[in-house]
């Protein structure tokens, strides 16, 4: 989950309202987010990670939307961990649904996996799911870039909030929704 707190000094006598989420033509599925338009070969942060043989073998048995516990894995490929049926471990994206949460933590099969190809997503593909433009360059090691992307708030999501803040200060009306929290 992402929580965003907007605070405005009381002496300004302005009231921020939560902007109504834009629901244009439904949602964008993760396949379209990653593939449309195609990522250029020389695009920054689009380096593929080498997968181990066991990871590739495991991924061959995991269908889109499944993870290491919900897939029908052969005994020799099952993980030796108890519980965690709702885990993100070795979870493949479902190409027809929005992406699940992109996280900045890592290791142990939590890299976000392609729906068809037996591999983790590149950092550029992860960045696209967070709605970063392809010309935005992340700096640092692959793991550092992965953390930056996972810790980010999706660009398109924060854009609506920033526009609402600007309209609040300009005293321009905008469509809003009621908060599900009590006034603090």
Language-model regions, residue ranges each:
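Flexible, glycine-/basic-rich loop-and-beta segments that form/coincide
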Residues: 1-52, 56
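C-terminal target-recognition/interaction regions appended to catalytic cores
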Residues: 46-184
